[in-house]
């Protein structure tokens, strides 16, 4: 049972509780069943459940580490993409003219840039804390919001450039 408990703690440290919850939960349940059998003095069953718990915990640690690496990669990619989109938005905002650029930049785009800068910092902080799933989701949302703001800012400009129909 001690080996099973140690394997479960290792799995939790590897992120299995977040990234491989089914396998991790099965390991914990098997350990509980092992303890239950030991209190009933059925030591053979207790040993079987403890061995099962250890194997499940090792599988959970392996799966959790793999999934965590995948989500970390997705989060880092999403943050890079959002940062690039933010740079595009900032360039568009500056291209509205160096003098009084803030006055000429549409308010929704300006607001989206300001919020994206704050949210992007939060996504980077989440990655530093190893909270990869929220970081990935936040970065994807930032990217979409900024893209929508860029599109909205360009629509009036596109309409203004058209000639009236005769």
Regions found by a protein language model. Give the residues of each.
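Long, charged/polar, soluble alpha-helical segments
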Residues: 1-166
């Amino acid at each position: 049972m001690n080996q099973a408990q140690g394997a479960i703690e290792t799995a939790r440290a590897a992120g299995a509780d977040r990234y491989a919850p089914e396998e991790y939960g099965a390991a914990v349940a098997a350990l509980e069943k092992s303890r239950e059998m030991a209190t009933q003095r059925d030591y053979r069953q207790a040993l079987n459940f403890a061995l099962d718990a250890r194997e499940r915990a090792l599988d959970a640690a392996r799966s959790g580490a793999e999934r965590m690496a995948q989500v970390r990669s997705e989060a880092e990619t999403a943050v890079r993409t959002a940062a690039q989109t933010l740079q595009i938005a900032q360039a568009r905002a500056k291209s509205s003219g160096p003098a009084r650029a803030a006055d000429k930049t549409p308010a929704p785009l300006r607001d989206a840039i300001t919020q994206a800068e704050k949210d992007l910092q939060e996504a980077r902080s989440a990655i530093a804390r190893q909270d990869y799933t929220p970081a990935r989701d936040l970065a994807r949302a930032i990217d979409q919001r900024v893209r929508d703001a860029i599109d909205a800012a360009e629509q009036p400009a596109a309409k203004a450039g058209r000639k009236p129909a005769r």
